[in-house]
UniProtKB/Swiss-Prot annotation:
This is Thaumatin-like protein 2. Belongs to the thaumatin family. It is found in: Secreted; Secreted, Cell wall. Keywords: Cell wall, Disulfide bond, Secreted. One of its GO terms (cellular component) is extracellular region.
Amino acid sequence: NQCPQAYSYAK
């Protein structure tokens, strides 16, 4: 995955 799940949560 290029973007970690944690990053998606912050979005």
